[in-house]
């Protein structure tokens, strides 16, 4: 899979640039930012075929699980009939991996080749049995560039290229509209290196605004996939740092600083 990194807050759906893949559309490739098979956690991955054509609406889909620790992949292929919805439990579907991300792409129902089938939507639900909390995360959805039914692997390299020729490009900038200062709150950022996986280190440039439109910069480097607390990524996300800035004293959230 070739593109730039994706990043997303665990409790927030992110929209990409207008030309890039995003959550509010049907497409041929769905990227689910996180699955969690650790003790007490359950992840349910759903994909729906919105094509209702009884003659031409059937497609195969391949689930590709990417282990977050080493970027090794595990694959399963299913068939979706017109209007069909499939939900899998990642702990059962891929029991030998703890955490990571998964992508699902359409394949020709006869040849098994990756194909244009811009009718797939999905969602992911992560349940914490210990706390009783549920988290719903929407996948990043990418439309295929070719006509319906056309093979998408234009360069025959076996990789789902997010280059505009096979699938939509991915944005190189993402805006997260609000975060709550770490200390009073705990938030996590999911980062995926879609360009090279574990083959090289990806560096994310961060611009962090306080609630008075002051901006601070930071960087974070990672390999493959990471899900980290904001305070671990940069001290600029913490309550103590934001209180030390020229922040707007009347714009806190129940005493907690906020930012963009």
Stretches found by the model and what they are:
Residues 19-260:
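Gly/Pro-rich, tryptophan- and cysteine-flecked surface segments typical
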């Amino acid at each position: 899979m070739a593109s730039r990194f994706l990043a997303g807050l665990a409790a927030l759906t992110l929209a990409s640039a207008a030309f890039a893949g995003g959550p509010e559309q049907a497409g041929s490739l769905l990227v689910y930012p996180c699955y969690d098979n650790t003790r007490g956690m359950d992840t349910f991955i759903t994909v729906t075929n919105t094509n209702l054509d009884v003659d031409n609406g059937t497609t195969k889909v391949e689930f590709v699980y990417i282990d977050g620790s080493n970027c090794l992949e595990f694959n399963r292929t299913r068939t979706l009939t017109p209007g069909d919805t499939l939900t899998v439990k990642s702990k059962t579907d891929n029991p030998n991996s703890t955490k990571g991300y998964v992508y699902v792409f359409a394949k020709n129902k006869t040849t098994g080749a990756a194909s244009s089938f811009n009718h797939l939507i999905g969602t992911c639900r992560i349940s914490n049995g210990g706390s009783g909390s549920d988290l719903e995360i929407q996948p990043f959805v990418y439309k295929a560039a070719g006509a319906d039914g056309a093979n998408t692997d234009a360069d025959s390299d076996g990789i789902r290229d997010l280059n505009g020729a096979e699938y939509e490009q991915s944005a190189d900038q993402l805006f997260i509209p609000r975060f709550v200062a770490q200390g009073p709150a705990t938030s996590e950022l999911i980062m995926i290196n879609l360009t090279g996986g574990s083959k090289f280190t990806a560096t994310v440039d961060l611009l962090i605004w306080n609630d008075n439109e002051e901006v601070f910069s930071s960087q974070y480097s990672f390999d493959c996939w990471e899900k980290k607390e904001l305070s671990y990524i940069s001290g600029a996300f913490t309550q103590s740092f934001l209180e030390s800035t020229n922040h707007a004293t009347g714009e806190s959230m129940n005493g907690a600083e906020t930012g963009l």
